[in-house]
Amino acid sequence: MSERHLFTSESVSEGHPDKIADQISDAILDAMLAQDPQARVAVETSVTTGLVLVFGEVSTKAYVDIQKVVRDTIKSIGYVDGQYGFDGDNCAVLVSLDEQSPDIAQGVDDSLETRSGDADPLDQIGAGDQGMMFGYAINETPELMPLPIALSHRLMRKIAALRKDGTIKWLRPDAKAQVTVEYDEDNQPKRIDTVVLSTQHDPDVDLDTIRQTVIDQVIKAVLPADLLDDQTKYLVNPTGRFVIGGPQGDAGLTGRKVIVDTYGGFAHHGGGAFSGKDATKVDRSASYAARYIAKNVVAAGLADQVEVQLAYAIGVAEPVSIAVDTAGTGKVSDEALINAIRENFDLRPAGIIKMLDLQRPIYRQTAAYGHFGRTDIDLPWEHTDKVDALKAVFK
């Protein structure tokens, strides 16, 4: 048994500069996939005061009005007022998109297996890059996610909803939340120790109003009352003022919130970001597949928690390795789990794309509030439709 300990995770709102960039990149990806499901897309975005830069590599038959997609995305987030130092109607938008490198394309279009004479059509697509990707699930929340990141996302979704429906009129789009959970000797969540929430606001609202409103209408409205006690600390706008925010306050860049996007630091991360990438990029698709595996393993009762690692070589279809770690909670051996995974999940890029139906415009909705454990949207890698097949292996 371990001693009681604290664990902290954070989330950020859709108006955070890095998340604006993620959403623009994924909105462009979606617009291309809507016209051309085979599009190869790797789009990065940078945002700063009054300026958006879109750059990367694309191979597609689609025609997309990038300027319109960028401006519509910014306005939908809530940047519609020039007083914010950044708004969708008046910012400059610069675009520099090249074609995908033919050196990369030849390995993705025709994998090593295909070039070696393998006739299986699902061997056709080689991995778009080398790397390792992780998926994780744990049974401490209904969505099988770690509690600290799940609660942090809930806070951010709530404050965005209150801003967008006009309930709290002085809110502006940029915000961050951080939740510290105390775990007991058996590694079970015991209580919430600290909540940090910083939100951008209009200049004419006082700090006491901000703090009391956020505690009452956001924090206590969202967090489980049985985990809050008189020792829980609430730190709301602890700098005292947060008027300048969004891209005016900090430059933003696609792919800088990879821990917010995943498990809040509870599990390993391979380093690759998701947004702006089509599903031939295993940074994205294999991370989704690894979560799909992990969630089904835990939902099947085969472990209380599991971390799955997949690794790929560029231009090769089959993963070079599969590893699992149940942290001692497995009801079967890790080796047996790996065999069951190989039997029930096709982890070649084309197999993942087919299994999870990934050549669709479904990505913009993932670019804020996390890619995993989402209860507000339907994502194929969150389905638990492999539970019966996994259980059958161990009957």
UniProtKB/Swiss-Prot annotation:
Pathway(s) this gene product operates in, as recorded in its UniProt entry: Amino-acid biosynthesis; S-adenosyl-L-methionine biosynthesis; S-adenosyl-L-methionine from L-methionine: step 1/1
Gene Ontology BP annotations: one-carbon metabolic process; S-adenosylmethionine biosynthetic process
Cofactor binding mode and count: Binds 2 divalent ions per subunit. Binds 1 potassium ion per subunit.
Enzymatic reactions: L-methionine + ATP + H2O = S-adenosyl-L-methionine + phosphate + diphosphate
Binding residues annotated for Mg(2+), in chain numbering: D18
Region (Flexible loop): 100-110
Protein name: S-adenosylmethionine synthase
